[in-house]
Amino acid sequence: MSKVKADKQSPKENTKAENSDNESIDDTASVATSTTSRSKSPGSRGRRQSRGHSKSKAKRPAYKYDCHLKEDHGQAIFGVSFNHLLGKDQSMVFATAGSNRCNIYECPRKGGLKLIMCYADPDPDEVFYTCSWSYDLKTSAPLLATAGYRGVIRVIDIHRNESVGNYVGHGQAINELKFHPRQANLLLSGSKDHAIRLWNIQTHVCIAIFGGVEGHRDEVLSIDFDLRGERIMSSGMDHSLKLWRIDTPEFKDKIEMSRTFNPNKSQLPFPTIMQHFPEFSTRDIHRNYVDCVQWFGDFVLSKSCENSIVCWKPGQLHQTLSQLKPNDPSCTIISEFNYDECEIWFVRFGFNPWHKIVALGNQYGKVYVWELDPSDPRHTHSSTLNNIRCTSIVRQTAFSRDATVLVWVCDDGTVWRWNRRNAEVHTP
């Protein structure tokens, strides 16, 4: 079995990284834009009704090409993530995950990309698929978690450029990692072994395993915490989306216990929770692999290989998440964001930290950007970013903390930076 799934493969080229920040945008890129409202009336359990289109004027694209470079391993880059935990006055820093490396870049305010660190896994056969940022609770040093084909989670101390934690438990590849939004020591992982695990990276214990009786029946491809860190949404190859709660008394007790647990002083292993039953589950949203999911308040954004991101809500529109009934798979579709030529899996969209802008690439190097109206997600401004040198599959996009920089990574080992033309996106 190949270590990289068929849709993840790309030609290997042993070329050195080259920075292209001096190239002229006028000669290298074309950008098509429009402002549209593509929505579907809310329909229970995936009931589809005709779309409504609003008339609006075209406007300039929000982002402009700045530069790109190519990493010297020449293989596909599957993951990219900005460090949103840094202050407003600190440099914008992001990481890429591809081959057996994680590269850390700085985005200077004047433009360009600056490589500041490269972590190479000791296993040359490793292929990293994902990365996520946190920090050390004792030293405040930035920490980067990464994982992939080998199923081993590495937690890297950026200041020391070395792994300070290695977590083995998943039986197969790990497709995505996410840190808890409020507790920096809690890490979530979703795997090819059909399971999701919650870890405490401070005490190195596995707090919970989500899966089993009513868990995913195939690879878990994407996971996400809600903003309060009380619920988890997961999606996978089984076409399903599942909601898991971690705000119950049992979970709160185990999370608290994990903070002080010392395996060297305990005669028994940590009592890991085995959670077999999700709070909610549905297969009515998508008909193919669901490879990306993120919370949008109490709504959910998810995508499959169907040229559409779906905004939906578990249960009926009037219900809160706490009012969901067990074994009730009903859901309400709020809106759809359509795009072209992205019919392969493991292509993930990016959400800016304040949930106002979504960006997704396709298999031919184009990136679609939607600016959402917080009061009504059915009304959006959309634009398409395109550079004639970018022709490879765009695997993932990411926004800086203030959304002034958009980066994406491709199958040909390239990293692209685009800058916002103005400062209309405000942070709290």
From Swiss-Prot:
Location relative to the cell: Nucleus
Any single Gene Ontology cellular-component annotation: nucleus
Residue stretches of biased makeup (Basic residues): 45-61
Main localization (coarse): nucleus
InterPro entries per UniProt: PcG_WD-repeat, WD40/YVTN_repeat-like_dom_sf, WD40_repeat_CS, WD40_repeat_dom_sf, WD40_rpt
Biased composition (Basic and acidic residues): 1-19
Region entry Disordered, spans: 1-61
WD repeats: 72-115, 124-166, 169-209, 215-254, 285-322, 341-380, 389-427
Organism superkingdom: Eukaryota
UniProt keywords, alphabetically: Developmental protein, Nucleus, Phosphoprotein, Repeat, Repressor, Transcription, Transcription regulation, WD repeat
PTM note: Phosphorylated.
Subunit text: Component of the Esc/E(z) complex, composed of Esc, E(z), Su(z)12, Rpd3, Caf1 and probably Pho. This complex is distinct from the PRC1 complex, which contains many other PcG proteins like Pc, Ph, Psc, Su(z)2. The two complexes however cooperate and interact together during the first 3 hours of development to establish PcG silencing.
Family note: Belongs to the WD repeat ESC family.
Function description: Polycomb group (PcG) protein. In contrast to other PcG protein, it is specifically required during the first 6 hours of embryogenesis to establish PcG silencing. PcG proteins act by forming multiprotein complexes, which are required to maintain the transcriptionally repressive state of homeotic genes throughout development. PcG proteins are not required to initiate repression, but to maintain it during later stages of development. They probably act via a methylation of histones, rendering chromatin heritably changed in its expressibility.
Name used for this protein in its record: Polycomb protein esc
Gene assigned in the entry: esc
